[in-house]
Amino acid sequence: NSFVGSRDNLEYSQRSITSALFSGQHSRDDNKLKIDWRIAPTFSSIADKDIRSTSYRTEDNTFAIAPGETGFPNRIWRELNEFNLANRLDFTRSHEFRGRDAKMKYGASYTFKYRDYEILRYQLRAKSLGNLNPLTGEADELLSEDFVWNVITDAGTYYSGNYEANNAYQGIQSNLAGYIHEEFSLNPLTKMVVGLRMERYDQFYTGVDQQEAAAPGTGINYQWEPVLNNFNLFPTASLIYSVNENSNLRFGAFRTVARPSFKEKSAAQIEDVLTGITFIGNLDLTNTTISNLDFRYEYFFEGGQTIGLSGFYKYFQNPIELVAYSAAAPSNFQPRNVGNATVAGAEFEVRKNLGFIGMKHLELNSNFSYILSSVTRDSSEFAARVASAREGEVISETRAMQGQSPYLINAGLSYNNPKNGWQGGLFYNVQGEKLYIVGVADNPDVFEVPFHSLNFNLLKNFGADRQYQLGLGVNNIIEDTRDRIFRSYNSHSPFFSTWAPGRTFKLSFRYSL
């Protein structure tokens, strides 16, 4: 069902963050044992106060409220409060290994996070608007005297809203960890680091599912339910070989983990009022375990200049991807664990002053990455794709990894002259086309088209102590758009969404005490 519509969106967001750091360092008189500790509490909040979204169906030069197509006008209040407490205790012991200096590091950490999230939604419904004056498309008119419902005409707009329990949740994440690793030299040119990290992770959830929210007593009411708890070991090993005094060769192997966020591992259904897309949490998510191999060759110049060439390989078990919820609800998306995946690539980077060509105040910074990724489709995804395949279409058991670009380019040319106080730069970056949302059945995949970002900034420091600074910034100089498209076999690529951020200018002034 296609239609033409327009949406007026007015948003106000208020954010705050309050943090503190308590830390200390202690050592023995001989400096063979050092102790570092830190305690860092953080309070943060986000309040979206009175988001107003008004949608009209616009056809034949008329405006209409069409709930089945554009939805009712909405007013939404969202509130997120989070407390984070990070604690660390680290020991460093100096000693000798085979007659050479070595260091053993060991310690523990504990991280605690608490989140409270709530959405209040009210709909502006309408009754018998056809009996009133024609709508003009102005959002304010729906609450004017001419359109607000009254008992005499029994026609007009009115507010309707209920507390949606499934869109409110509380969560706790607790991570207790300990580690030990040893840094030592095998010979004058070769250094090795080996270690092991242990983590006990627990996540708890309070909230209700969709069924319980719709009909209390018929669904599930979670009260600090343990939704994720595991004990993991993360080994690491790296080898650093000094080719000469200006270059190193590094090899590394290590294991990491990616865990679902509060939002991902919830029963909440969170709508983006601007796009109409709904994010649906998933309480069945599990950890993603990542095994990593990498190598790097780096050459050093004076003044922190470097040239580096890297290669890497990653193996993902149970990666989390954003997937269309169902064939019947392709505009609703949910994070899900999918089949195992691999990512391999190479990166070249350079940071070089251009003084060798007579431009000592200019510096080139750039890096380029080329990446290959592959995900094994799980049985349900593969079967649904085969069942809905078009004539001549061959469905592969693998595909690209969601969110992974095949290439990345970053390039910047910086100018810095401390004598006259001028500094600035021109910066460009782009990522290759990547899978944004995994389709389901006959609903196609959504891809994000490369966005070419070209930005410029210029700063002037002045004053006796250079305490004043004027700045000019220009972002998206070429006025590129952020486009997402549907991609399917033997078809054109219609837009899923397009956004034109435009070119932006920024003026700044700073005074340093």
Question: What function would you assign to each model-found segment?
Answer:
Residues 2-26, 163-176, 228, 257-316, ...:
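Outer-membrane beta-barrel signature, preferentially recognizing the C-terminal barrel domain
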